Regions:
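N-terminal targeting signals for export/organelle localization
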Residues: 1-54, 212
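Short active-site neighborhood of thiol/selenol oxidoreductases, capturing the structured segment around
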Residues: 65-95, 111
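Thiol-/selenol-based redox modules, centered on thioredoxin-like
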Residues: 163-212
Length: 212
């Protein structure tokens, strides 16, 4: 099994506050940097937050998927592999609750990256999706180059480890909530039903949040 560990030291960049309509605002997670620029002749400092980089993958239908396909969407990401005998089935069962809650909602996606692309071919991913009852384009199972996926995982504040000396894969599963600007807004234990309920509630909060 492959180890997925949410990186220690996630930086909380935005304290929870309130909208004018008294709705909770989710924090922005990850690194940030200050950028100085001139606007209307005035020097101002802006904050640039960590975002998910450009991607290029293939989904379970054989369609090419890149970051442009996620533009303007709130989405949840996770990492898995189809032969995982332990927590992946629990994660995917819990992700089905998220899928069923939002499958008819516009502006929402789920992206699940396989960390074993050698085994998880497109036909394998399609059979896996069919077994889960996934249809349509709300939830994509994505296959790409392993090294690229490992780098992408880091951008989600998740680390991926290779096989251990015994030849086994080990992984912890987390669901990562991304906003329309591709910023990280929450991390959730995908094996914990209470955490998944919180994720569903936070998606609703994020959908109500104005894009600034």
């Amino acid at each position: 099994m492959k180890k997925l560990v949410v990186a220690i030291g996630i930086v909380l960049l935005w304290n929870a506050c309130k909208f004018n309509n008294n709705e909770k605002v989710l924090p922005i997670l990850g690194s940030r940097r200050a950028v100085t620029k001139v606007v209307n002749g005035q020097t101002v400092t802006d904050t640039v937050y960590q975002t998910i980089p450009a991607i290029k993958y293939i989904n379970q239908y054989g369609d090419s998927i890149n970051d442009k396909n996620l533009d303007g969407n709130i989405y949840v990401a996770d990492f898995f592999f189809t032969t995982c005998p332990s927590i992946c089935p629990i994660m995917q069962r819990n992700m089905l609750n998220v899928y069923n809650a939002f499958k008819d909602s516009t502006g929402f996606k789920i992206v699940s990256y396989t960390i074993d692309p050698q085994h998880d071919s497109i036909p394998v991913l399609k059979r896996y999706a069919d077994k889960l009852g996934i249809n349509g384009n709300t939830w994509w199972l994505l296959q790409g180059h392993k090294d690229e996926t490992y780098q992408v995982a880091k951008s989600y504040l998740v680390s991926v480890q290779e096989k251990n000396p015994a030849g086994e894969y080990i992984h912890d599963g987390y669901f990562i909530l991304i906003d329309k600007k591709k910023r990280i807004r929450g991390t959730y234990d995908g094996t914990n039903p209470d955490e998944v309920k919180k994720l569903i509630a936070d998606i609703k909060i994020l959908k109500a949040e104005p894009v600034i």
